[in-house]
Amino acid sequence: CYPTFGGSGVVATELGIALSKIGHTIHFITYHQPVRLETLNTDNIHFHEVEIPDYPLFKYQPYELALSSRLVDVVKAHAIDVLHVHYAIPHAYAGYMAKKMLIDDGFHIPIVTTLHGTDITLVGSHPFYRPAVTFSINHSDKVTAVSESLKNDTLRLFDITTKIDVITNFIDIKKIEAKVMPCKRDLLAPKSHKIITHISNFRPLK
């Protein structure tokens, strides 16, 4: 997953934490510790950093190659049962490459790909990326989308031959406390205006 405040990283992290609480061992594999992974003081949550060597030949460092190799290393070292990749680019593609490399070494691991939004509707649908995204989705063992709308967009924008199941995003309501906070609403907007709050990463699209 991406380790940022974006929805894909948050959902991936919270899902992993929730699974760890019911006895599963979770390994997060990304280029930085996820922002929602506040502690590693447990026996069944682990973080593996993807290091990207800086080689002058490359104008852009090949993160997908580094990620694929790291996935292979972690699967072999820790006997991982399943890879769950969040956000189609580049994680689904890297997951597929890791799976193929592992097969050559006698490891057979299923890939679950979760589609989150702009990885499909904005980035993934770009002509430069569409063939790789289509291939990665179709070669995943399981594909989920976070909404019916995203599922429909994926089917509309790509030639998808595999089933997509919808599993909506979630929150842990136990973390939320009902608090009444005094607020001078007129400082934000006139009474006739609605106030909408959006929380995400700080990309121009948002």
Stretches found by the model and what they are:
Residues 56-83, 92-97, 127-131, 135, ...:
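An amphipathic, basic-hydrophobic alpha-helix
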Residues 5-6, 173, 203-206:
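A short, basic/aromatic alpha-helical/loop segment that forms part
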Residues 176-190:
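A short helix/loop element that forms part of the nucleotide-sugar donor recognition site in Leloir-type
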Residues 103-112, 118-136, 152, 180:
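Nucleotide-sugar donor phosphate/pyrophosphate-binding loop at the beta->alpha transition
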Residues 32, 149, 170:
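Carbohydrate-associated surface elements
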Residues 144, 189-206:
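Conserved donor-binding/catalytic core segment of Leloir-type glycosyltransferases
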Residues 1-35, 43-48:
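N-terminal subdomain of nucleotide-sugar transferases
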Residues 138-148:
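A short beta-strand/loop micro-motif in the catalytic core of glycosyltransferases
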